[in-house]
Amino acid sequence: MSYLILVRHGQSIWNLENRFTGWVDVDLNDNGRAQAKKAGDLIKEQKINIDLYYSSFQLRAKNTLKIIQEQLDDNKKVKFAWELNERHYGSLTGLNKDEMKKKLGEEKVHQFRRSWDLRPDPLDKNNSYHPLNINTYKDVPVEKIPDTESLKDTYERVIKYYSCLLYTSPSPRDNPA
């Protein structure tokens, strides 16, 4: 039987501060590291042999997976893909969610966060939080880097990546070494 295990990163420093994070490289906090350890323990309890690991480029996701692999005593290589990144929140990036509700109104912030095809205003390319200014994304083609994304944009990016994986990547079990 094949499994697809999806794990969200553990709590990050900005999650705790209630900030829009998006593509900014924010690390896990202590609680996030404990959550990742627990996720690893839960997977280990199920005795699932994991063939392939994939992660977004984001530090919080990478470190969550690293901790999970430590719990599983598994050092298989990981395929990192920017296409698996979280949604890019545009001009909301780095801002406190509660402060933005006071400034823009709760309904407007809710629309930005939950509407299918509404994008927040784009993040200025000169902003230090823009992916063009973050070393993590230096090898991503500039035309692929968004200034903002809707949920629909994010969905389409991630589904396109998963679809390519599902239809082009054979399981290592199909081709034993």
Where are these regions (language model features)?
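Phosphate-coordination/substrate-recognition cap region in phosphate-metabolizing enzymes
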Residues: A39-P131, Y137, T148, Y155, ...
